[in-house]
Design a protein with these regions (language model features):
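Non-transmembrane, aqueous-exposed alpha-helical and coiled segments at domain scale
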Residues: 4-120, 125-167
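N-terminal glycine-rich anion-binding loops that anchor highly charged ligand groups
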Residues: 1
Length: 167
């Protein structure tokens, strides 16, 4: 499934086709002409495949300026099935975060399709955490946070995850 994060400058004006329609047309062409796996169903209860992986998931944010920035995260449903949400109490602190991350990766085990890339969202509501985690997956894998203590946590968790010996 194609997940898009779109930042639109407040001074941008689109003409012609609606942005959502244009993105879905791009997804349609990419999946039908690019020989990519078609795995999206229009209605999850009926299970009828759309055969072109539309509609895409769009997250749109209005920002300052006159530019458009689009990031796309092609997601397989194996990775979606391995997603986890942990609601921690404030008293759980950073240890609770560490435990939750390792538990999620351990539980996913070999069921997640390689390579395993872990996105973590911390704070806010249920939906905000999921969105933050998904946005984290759009960062280059060799890029770390600019915040020193977050960078330290990322490096620590990568080391501990690799020590699990999952693959």
């Amino acid at each position: 499934m194609a997940v898009f994060f779109v930042e639109i400058g407040q001074d941008v004006h689109f003409e012609g086709q609606w942005l959502e329609d244009a993105i879905n047309e791009g997804v349609r062409q990419g999946y039908t002409e690019g020989y990519l796996r078609k795995s999206v169903v229009g209605d999850p209860l009926i299970r009828e495949n759309t055969k072109d992986n539309t509609p895409a998931v769009l997250h749109i944010r209005i920002v300052e300026g006159d530019r458009v920035k689009i990031k796309v995260a092609p997601k397989g449903f194996g990775s979606e099935n391995m997603s986890r949400v942990f609601m921690l109490k404030p008293a759980d602190g950073i240890e609770g975060v560490r435990h939750a991350i390792l538990t999620a990766v351990k539980d996913a085990g070999p069921n997640a399709c390689p390579p395993m890339v872990v996105g973590v969202g911390i704070g806010g509501t249920f939906e905000k955490c999921a969105l933050l985690a998904k946005q984290a997956l759009t960062r280059p894998v060799d890029e770390h946070s600019d915040i020193p203590y977050v960078k330290d946590l990322e490096e620590e968790m990568l080391s501990k995850i690799n020590q699990l010996g999952i693959g």
